[in-house]
Amino acid sequence: MAENERTTENFQPQDPSYAEAATTEASAAEATGFIARIDQLAAENSDLQKKLADYEQKYTRLMADFDNFRKRTQREKDELAYFVSAKLLKDILPVFDNFDRARAFAQPDNEREEKLHNSYQQVYRQFLSVLEKMGVTAMEAIGQPFDPAQHEAILREESAGVSQETVVAELQKGYLLADKVLRPAMVKVAIPEAGS
C-alpha cells in the first residue's frame, strides 16, 4: 500500500490541456454562478424599487391627508371660537346699546353731574375698545343701499329722491364680527315712488 500511495502522490497529468480544460470548466461554472447571482440581485433590487415607490406614494398620500386634517381641525377650531364669541357678543350688545342711549341722553346740569357724565364716557370708550379688540365693528347703514343680509327693514316709505331702496334711518345699530354679520341693523328704508 505504501507503493500505491507514492504513485498517487507523484501523479501528474501528462497532458497540459487537461489542466487547462479543468480550469476553463471551473471558470465557466463560476461565471454561470455569478451571472445567476447578479440576476437574482437585480430581481431583488427591482422588487425593492417597487416597494420603495409604493411606500413613497403611501407617505405622500398620508402627508396630504394629515395636512388636510390639520387644516380642517384649524377651521373647525376657528368656527367654534367664532360661534362662542358671537353668542357672547350678541348677549352683550343690548347692554352696550342701552349704555349708548343713556350716554346720549345724559345732560349734566352741574359740576357733579359733569364728572359723572365724563366717567360714563370713559367707561363707554373702554367698552367700545374691548369690542373692537374682539373684532366687532359697527355697520354704516344710513345712505347705503338696502341689503337684507345686513339690514332688517322695520319701516318703509316712498321717496322721490331715491332710485333704489336706500337706508334713510337707523333704529338700532348693526355690527360685524370678523366681516360677518353679528347683528343686522334695524333700519327705515326709502323706496322709489310707484310712478317713477
Swiss-Prot record:
Function: Participates actively in the response to hyperosmotic and heat shock by preventing the aggregation of stress-denatured proteins, in association with DnaK and GrpE. It is the nucleotide exchange factor for DnaK and may function as a thermosensor. Unfolded proteins bind initially to DnaJ; upon interaction with the DnaJ-bound protein, DnaK hydrolyzes its bound ATP, resulting in the formation of a stable complex. GrpE releases ADP from DnaK; ATP binding to DnaK triggers the release of the substrate protein, thus completing the reaction cycle.
Cellular localisation: Cytoplasm
Organism lineage string: Bacteria, Bacillati, Cyanobacteriota, Cyanophyceae, Gloeobacterales
Keyword Cytoplasm annotated: yes
Complex and partners: Homodimer.
Gene Ontology, cellular component aspect: cytoplasm
Chain segments carrying region Disordered: 1-24
First-listed, main subcellular location of the protein, grouped into a coarse class: cytoplasm
Annotated signal peptide: none
HAMAP family per the UniProt record, alphabetical: GrpE (MF_01151)
Pfam family for this entry, one: GrpE
Gene source species: Gloeobacter violaceus (strain ATCC 29082 / PCC 7421)
Name of the protein: Protein GrpE
GO molecular function annotations of the record: adenyl-nucleotide exchange factor activity; protein homodimerization activity; protein-folding chaperone binding; unfolded protein binding
Keyword Cell inner membrane: no
